[in-house]
Amino acid sequence: MAAQCVRLARRSLPALALSLRPSPRLLCTATKQKNSGQNLEEDMGQSEQKADPPATEKTLLEEKVKLEEQLKETVEKYKRALADTENLRQRSQKLVEEAKLYGIQAFCKDLLEVADVLEKATQCVPKEEIKDDNPHLKNLYEGLVMTEVQIQKVFTKHGLLKLNPVGAKFDPYEHEALFHTPVEGKEPGTVALVSKVGYKLHGRTLRPALVGVVKEA
C-alpha cells in the first residue's frame, strides 16, 4: 500500500511542477508594469527638472538686479570719494598758497609803523630850510627820502602796495571814513583827505586808509 502511494506521487510531480511554473504572459505583464512605473518616475523627474529652470532664471535675474544696484552704489560712492579728495586737495593747495602770500602779514604790519615814522619825519622837515648853506639838514632830509623810497621798493617786491586814495571813490573795503564834510568843487562820495595811508598785501587790504569823505553841501 505504501509503495503504491509513492509510485502515485512520483507520477503526479511533473504535472505539479508544470502547474507551478510561471506563465510567460504573466512575466511579460509584470515586466511591463515595472517598466511603466520606472518610466513614470523618470517622466515625473524630467517634468520637475523642466519646471526648475524658470525658478533658477528668476533667481539669477534677481541676483543680477541686486549686483547692478550694488555696482551703481559703489560707483557713486567712488565718485563722491574722488570729488571729496579733489576738493580737499584744492583746499590744501589754496591754504599753502595763502600761507606763502600772507605768511608775512604780521611782519608787514610791524614794518608799516616804521614806514609811517619815516613818512612823518620827511614831512616834518621844513622845505624852506633845505639849502646848500645848511648841509646837515639837507643831507638828513635826502637820507630820509632815500630810506623811504627804498622801503617802498621792498614793500612792492613782496606785494605790499600803498593806498593813497585822494580824489578816488570811497571804498569801504579799502578806506575808513574818519569824517564827512562838504568840499566845494569835489564830488560827493569821493575822498577829500587822507589822514593815514593804507596798504594792501597781494590784493588783500592789510590796513585801510584813514580818510575824510566829501558829502553834499
UniProtKB/Swiss-Prot annotation:
Residues found modified as N6-succinyllysine: 94, 120, 215
User: Where does this chain mainly localize?
Assistant: mitochondrion
Q: Which residues carry this modification: N6-acetyllysine?
A: 94, 100, 215
Q: Where in the cell is it found?
A: Mitochondrion matrix
Q: Which GO terms describe its cellular component?
A: mitochondrial inner membrane; mitochondrial matrix; mitochondrion; nucleoplasm; PAM complex, Tim23 associated import motor; TIM23 mitochondrial import inner membrane translocase complex
Q: Which family does it belong to?
A: Belongs to the GrpE family.
Protein's name according to its UniProt entry: GrpE protein homolog 1, mitochondrial
Query: What is the scientific name of the source organism?
Result: Homo sapiens
